Amino acid sequence: MKDKTNLTGLNPDNFRSVINGKDTGLYILRNGSGMEMCVTNYGAIVLSIMAPDSHGKFENVVIGFDTLEEARRQSKDYYIGATIGPVAGRILHGAFRVGEKDYHLQLNSVSNTLHSGDNGFHTVVWEAQQPCENQLLLRLFHADGEAGFPGNVTVRMMYTLTDDNGFRIDYEAETDREPCSVPPIMPILTWRAWELPLLPLKTIW
């Protein structure tokens, strides 16, 4: 049975769990135009984005999941909807040097490290706060040495549905290491799989 608290019909009970001592849940964002987004704080996964087309009909424009178990499986195998970090992309041979120190990571893509390995940001529970109906603040502490990366890092990410039916993501990261002691870039990525309705063929925006 579809839940009536959100346009997608996702049941909040299907996303309530405790993983590594942290609570997971379903968060619903809405803007003043009725656009709606559902998110779980596991992996900061976006589960649905209900956006209006040019006729005012709402459609889900991303590939999403009905349960936490399905979202965990798909984000682990295919990263769908999840936030990738500390480093998105491939690290050649799973190794890098910062200053005079070499770091070696898990190899999960033949002889390389893909999207920070199997214990990246997409596999952890983020702290979540909803300051207002159209925003969700997600916070993560990534300890020194976790997944093989140096430095204690605090990541803050804000999901916002704008009044013009946009989806904005703001990232912020702080570390306790000197600039020369951590990787010069932290390319975090929120992986979206867009699913634009094709029937009938029409202009959505």
PLM regions and their residue ranges:
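Surface-exposed acidic/polar loop and edge beta-strand patches at domain peripheries
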Residues: 2-205
